[in-house]
């Protein structure tokens, strides 16, 4: 009996294969570029006889035995619901053909060519494949809604797929196949043993399980205070931490050395001033052109990894500006993605005749912990005044910006009522008055001007030169700790010179500069005419102090200044460590290259009585930066 059944099945096998081949030929008559309209697969399934339906559900090998059919890739959002119980082959094929109509949205990028759809996916049975298959296709643009079965309209583009991957027989299905998902699905699978495999995909497991972070993986370098660190204000403390002053971003101003907050853009306004604003843009230095847009990169250090070149201003400046930008953003609590108010264009609300405070100005100051962040010194230089203008007339010309006091060098001693050299200083009571003054100025060749009248001269343009607090400090190499034993004092620094420019000059001369700072008044935060430069190595430090004098050349600045070791007033004696002087701080420092140490009075006398050291001269700290009270009446 079994032999008869076997012979009948073998006789039917060629007929079934021939009918299946005819059905495939009908299905693939359309050219590869042709796309079938929806519903054509359902019509073909209904037109096929039951024997052909049987062929879709199973495949037979050469021995006539039933083998596992090729299952189609189970895609994201469609949980395959296996049929419970054992059904007939016809029932299995019927459920498979009807389930093919369950995909609601298929990627339109699928090639309609049937030859490209006969793919072997990683979870296919290798023994059931009949040809050499290329790498699997990934389909990622379908819906991610989970359903317990297949339903809806099936897209026309996977018609050829149904011819080669019919549904499996219930005998050979495993329980875990009920929830099989595509590896491209962003939803986690229902089982923990698949979650691990899903999370191993670097472009899926980590990114799709959570929203992308705009901050990336970058962490700004933290400044670690050490016993040898000191503050830019001249005190003793950590990196750039000083009393009454935040850490300065020593980045180069994107516009000019006078007004980094002003920006002019082309507009339709008619300029009636004597010195119109330069709408074509400011004449910036070549190595600061790409710092105008400070928020152009999310990751500050990833795109500028060039090596430092002490003589290449371009490569050095780009990297340094990024370092300072990131450190300043991390310390002030804001990100480069969200620029401060001074980054906005001046053309948004340009009013050259803005009066009084800067509340209505487009450059309104941001607030941090309820307090406004200061950007400028309250002391402003005014040059080119008319020779016959007196103090009252100067006050009247600038009183519209806020309460102020007019001062000039040796004013109290000279008893003069007129500025003797044609310049003066405006000391404003409120820092916002300085911003209002800047907004009212005209810009010409990178300088700010404001028209002032005297009894004999009408509307004479005078130069306005405010001091940006960010220009007080500049870190060239944040990876190096600040060592006061490798720091020099630079006296007679021109007041317009910024910290970044001082660092560039010293690094070009001696190399190894890691920090530069401009000494400022603790109350008004205006430059005092001195600076500090810290080196990262002893050789550069010794070379600088051995020179004694340095020629500072930058732009219009060309001045010879004195260089000395930077002396601290809180160091113990290097010889006795305070044992011979009762633990008092050492008052003397020997700047000779054979010593370079702090000494108490006893050790100085003992060491420098030796032959060859009797001519060494001690350096004494002239006094720290102590707040001073200015007694005058605001006008």
UniProtKB/Swiss-Prot annotation:
Q: Which residues form the RRM domain?
A: 378-469, 486-568
Gene Ontology molecular functions: mRNA 3'-UTR binding; mRNA regulatory element binding translation repressor activity; ribosome binding; translation factor activity, RNA binding
For the region Disordered, what residue ranges are annotated?
A: 1-70, 149-284, 337-369
Segments of skewed composition (Gly residues): 232-241
Q: Known PROSITE patterns for this protein?
A: RRM
Q: What is its main location?
A: cytoplasm
Compositionally skewed regions (Polar residues) per UniProt: 14-30, 254-283
Output the InterPro entries linked to this UniProt entry: CEBP_ZZ, CEBP_ZZ_sf, CPEB, Nucleotide-bd_a/b_plait_sf, RBD_domain_sf, RRM_dom
Xref: CDD domains: Bbox1, RRM1_CPEB2_like, RRM2_CPEB2_like
Composition-biased stretches (Basic residues):
166-182
Q: Which cysteines are joined by disulfide bonds?
A: none
* Signal sequence, renumbered to the chain: none
Where on the tree of life does the source sit, at the highest rank?
Answer: Eukaryota
Q: Which GO terms describe its biological process?
A: cellular response to amino acid stimulus; cellular response to decreased oxygen levels; cellular response to glucose starvation; ionotropic glutamate receptor signaling pathway; negative regulation of cytoplasmic translation; negative regulation of neuron apoptotic process; response to ischemia
* Cellular component terms per the entry's GO annotation: cytoplasm; dendrite; dendritic spine; endoplasmic reticulum; growth cone; neuron projection; nucleus; perinuclear region of cytoplasm
Q: What does this protein do?
A: Sequence-specific RNA-binding protein that binds to the cytoplasmic polyadenylation element (CPE), an uridine-rich sequence element (consensus sequence 5'-UUUUUAU-3') within the mRNA 3'-UTR. RNA binding results in a clear conformational change analogous to the Venus fly trap mechanism.
In the record, the note on similarity to other proteins reads: Belongs to the RRM CPEB family.
Name under which the protein is recorded: Cytoplasmic polyadenylation element-binding protein 4
């Amino acid at each position: 009996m079994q032999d008869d059944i076997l012979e009948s099945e073998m006789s039917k096998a060629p007929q079934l294969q021939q009918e299946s081949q005819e059905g495939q030929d009908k299905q693939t008559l359309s050219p590869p570029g042709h796309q079938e309209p929806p519903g054509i697969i359902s019509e073909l399934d209904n037109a096929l006889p039951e024997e052909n339906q049987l062929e879709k559900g199973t495949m037979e090998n050469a021995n006539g035995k039933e083998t596992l059919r090729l299952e189609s890739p189970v895609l994201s959002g469609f949980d395959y619901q296996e049929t419970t119980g054992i059904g007939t082959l016809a029932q299995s094929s019927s459920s498979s053909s009807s389930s093919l109509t369950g995909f609601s949205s298929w990627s339109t990028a699928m090639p309609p060519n049937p030859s490209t759809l006969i793919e072997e996916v990683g979870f296919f049975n290798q023994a059931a494949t009949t040809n050499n298959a290329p790498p699997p296709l990934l389909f990622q643009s379908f819906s991610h809604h989970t359903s317990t079965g297949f339903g809806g309209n099936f897209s026309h583009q996977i018609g050829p797929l149904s011819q080669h991957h019919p549904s499996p027989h219930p005998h050979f299905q495993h329980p875990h196949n009920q929830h099989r998902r595509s590896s491209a699905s962003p939803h986690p699978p229902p089982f923990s043993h698949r979650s691990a495999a899903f999370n191993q995909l670097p472009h899926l497991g980590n990114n799709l399980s959570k929203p992308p972070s705009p901050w990336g993986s970058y962490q700004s370098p933290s400044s670690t205070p050490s016993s040898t660190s000191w503050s830019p204000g001249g005190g003793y403390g950590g990196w750039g931490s000083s009393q009454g002053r935040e850490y300065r971003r020593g980045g180069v101003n994107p516009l000019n050395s006078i007004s980094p907050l002003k920006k002019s853009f082309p507009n339709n306004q008619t300029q009636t001033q004597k010195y119109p604003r330069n709408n074509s843009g400011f004449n910036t230095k070549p190595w600061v052109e790409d710092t105008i847009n400070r928020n152009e990169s999310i990751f500050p250090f990833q795109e500028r990894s060039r090596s430092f070149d002490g003589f290449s201003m371009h490569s050095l400046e780009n990297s340094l500006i990024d370092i300072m930008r990131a450190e300043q953003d991390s310390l002030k609590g804001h990100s480069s993605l969200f620029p401060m108010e001074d980054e906005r264009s001046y053309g948004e609300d340009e009013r050259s005749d803005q009066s009084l405070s800067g509340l209505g100005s487009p450059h309104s100051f941001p607030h941090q912990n309820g307090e406004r962040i200061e950007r400028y010194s309250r002391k402003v230089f005014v040059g080119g005044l008319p020779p016959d203008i007196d103090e009252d007339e100067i006050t009247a010309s600038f009183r519209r910006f806020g309460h102020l006091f007019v001062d000039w060098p040796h004013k109290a001693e000279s008893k003069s009522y007129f500025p003797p050299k044609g310049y003066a200083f405006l000391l404003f009571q409120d820092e916002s008055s300085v911003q209002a003054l800047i907004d009212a100025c005209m810009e010409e060749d990178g300088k700010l001007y404001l028209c002032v009248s005297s009894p004999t001269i009408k509307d004479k343009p005078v130069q306005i030169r405010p001091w940006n607090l960010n220009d007080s400090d500049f870190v060239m190499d944040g990876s190096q700790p600040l060592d006061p034993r490798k720091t020099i004092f630079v006296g007679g620094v021109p007041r317009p010179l910024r910290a970044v420019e001082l660092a560039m000059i010293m690094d070009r001369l001696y190399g190894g500069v890691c920090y530069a700072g401009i000494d400022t008044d603790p109350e008004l935060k205006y430059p005092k005419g001195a600076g500090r430069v810290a080196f990262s190595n002893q050789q550069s430090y010794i070379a600088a102090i051995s020179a004694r004098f340095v020629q500072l050349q930058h732009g219009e600045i060309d001045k010879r200044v004195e260089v000395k070791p930077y002396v601290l007033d809180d160091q113990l004696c290097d010889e006795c460590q305070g044992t011979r002087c009762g633990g008092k701080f050492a008052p003397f420092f020997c700047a000779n290259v054979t010593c370079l140490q702090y000494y108490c009075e006893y050790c100085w006398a003992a060491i420098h009585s030796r032959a060859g050291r009797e001519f060494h001269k001690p350096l004494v700290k002239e006094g720290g930066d102590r707040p001073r009270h200015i007694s005058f009446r605001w006008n």
